[in-house]
Design a protein with these regions (language model features):
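Membrane-embedded translocation segments of transport machinery
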Residues: 2-7, 11, 169, 173-321, ...
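Transmembrane helix-boundary motif of multi-pass solute transporters/channels
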Residues: 13-53, 238, 249-252, 256-259, ...
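Select transmembrane alpha-helical segments in multipass membrane proteins
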Residues: 10-21, 45-49, 87-101, 147-152, ...
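Membrane-interface "cap" regions at the ends of multi-pass membrane proteins
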Residues: 1-32, 61-66, 70-83, 87-94, ...
Length: 457
């Protein structure tokens, strides 16, 4: 193991880890998914529940996964395997490793959609995006959706080929500051539109009347995306972290950064929707279509909407790229560690998997629309399988590994290697042993029961 540790790639320091891990978190999950869920499930009350959960459940899982990666210098399969070869441990490692392999193909399809929208705004055809039927016609076109998906995929793989420092870290150091600046600019523009203050109030001020059990379940599910929990990413990135870098300080920074960007995304989109529709309930309930159908209509109704459209979809593209890089890196690392493959060979295999599975999702609304998985289109199925089933199971596996196999004390020792005290140790200990596995089980049971029609969510 010592030889492997010496040869393993590493981030240059805290900044490299923070920006790369934040890049993994600040993706479509925050820019695309968080705002439409906040709009749909109560605005301010959803935000409050999310922040409380992120500061407890989310924080605990980030620390646990990062520490696990650093103490073993392994990606998920090797990290679990370092503590035994029993079937349960192998299962826990592989489910954490397989998740990013299944997510990044359909994630890249959505990234391709973003490329299409950005290119339309840049070419001066942004007004076409606001027309009824544009989005459905595009995703059902087959060839256009496939080409955009392939462009996004090739760009991601090119960065992965370059390695951890020259690829992942370098791109994150450039894209993340730009993403922050664009977020502030667009949010500032959005909240100053006529009627937008009602949207700000809806998003930031909790209203208990909007609270429901679904608010909690949805906020818990969103955390997996917003903080990159249970995807194998944080274990992998933790394995690249140097021993003199503070885990607690680094993970707190990632947590705060990701949450701040999620809030900024809400301020970009929800006030703009209120300005456009006056807070029409149907518009707020638009769900996943909010960014690709409603937002172009909002921009079309604005002065300088063309410029805002370019900036907005450029921001979304940056966010999508940083997350797809992290997902792909986690997958590539698994093959490097477990099969002893070169980075080039592992990246080539992941590229083939991305093209094969991603093409199913890209063509799933067009030529393959008649083929479904359990009544769902391919993209919807892969999203349900990973987010609602596999991630909760992976989170439970992490909790059991830390609390029942490794021992919480070992994780505490890893966290304090930099010589600083573990300030939130009591919260971590209680959450990892009791509440985190319970929360993950609630998400799993609720999601599966809803899919089977036993409950309505």
């Amino acid at each position: 193991m010592d030889t492997q540790k010496q040869k393993r790639s590493a981030f240059s320091g805290k900044i490299g880890f923070v920006l790369s891990a934040a890049g993994a978190s600040v993706g479509l999950g925050n820019i695309w998914r968080f705002p439409y869920l906040a709009a749909k499930y109560g605005g301010g009350i959803f935000l409050l529940v999310y922040i409380v959960l992120a500061a407890t459940f989310g924080y605990t899982m980030i620390v646990a996964e990062t520490a696990l990666g650093r103490m073993t210098h392994k990606s998920p399969v090797g990290a679990f395997g370092a503590f035994g070869k029993k079937g349960g441990l192998r299962f826990g490692g592989w489910i954490n490793a397989v998740i990013p392999i299944l997510i990044v193909p359909y994630y890249s399809v959505i990234g391709g959609w973003v490329i299409r929208y950005l290119s339309e705004y840049i070419s001066g055809h942004g007004s076409e995006l606001s027309q009824d039927g544009y989005f459905s016609n595009f995703i059902s076109s087959g060839l256009s959706a496939e080409v955009c998906f392939l462009i996004f995929t090739v760009f991601t793989l090119a960065i992965i080929f370059a390695g951890v420092r020259n690829g992942v870290e370098r791109v994150s150091k450039v894209m993340m500051p730009v993403l922050v600046v664009l977020s502030v600019v667009i949010a500032g523009y959005s909240v100053t539109r006529p009627g937008a203050l009602e949207g700000v109030k809806y998003f930031l001020v909790p209203n208990v009347a909007n609270f429901s059990w679904m608010t909690v379940v949805t906020a818990m599910g969103q955390m997996f995306y917003s903080l990159s929990i249970a995807m194998g990413i944080l274990v992998t990135f933790g394995s690249y972290m140097k021993k003199d870098v503070s885990i607690e300080e680094s993970t707190e920074t990632v947590e705060l950064f990701a949450t701040a960007i999620a809030i900024m995304a809400g301020l970009m989109i929800i006030p703009a929707v209120f300005s456009f529709s006056g807070g029409d309930p149907d518009t707020l309930q638009a769900g996943p279509a909010l960014m690709f159908i409603t937002i172009p209509k909002v921009f079309e109704s604005m002065g300088f909407g063309h410029v805002v459209g370019i900036l907005f979809f450029l921001l979304v593209l940056f966010a999508a790229v940083t997350s797809s890089i992290a997902l792909t890196e986690s997958a590539v690392s698994t093959f490097e560690d477990e099969l002893g493959w070169s980075r080039e060979r592992a990246t080539a295999l992941i590229g083939l998997i991305m093209v094969a599975l991603g093409s199913l999702s890209a063509l799933g609304y067009g030529p393959l629309a008649g083929v479904t998985m359990f009544g769902m289109q391919f993209l919807d199925f892969f999203d349900f399988l990973t987010n609602s089933v596999m991630m909760p199971i992976a989170a439970i596996a992490i909790c059991l590994l830390v609390s029942r196999v490794i021992g919480v004390q070992k994780i505490e020792e890893e966290v304090t290697l930099d010589g600083k005290p573990f300030r939130r140790k009591k919260i971590f200990n209680f959450m990892i042993q009791y509440l985190c596995p319970i929360f993950a089980a609630i998400i799993l049971i609720s999601s599966v029961a809803n899919a089977l029609g036993w409950i309505a969510m």
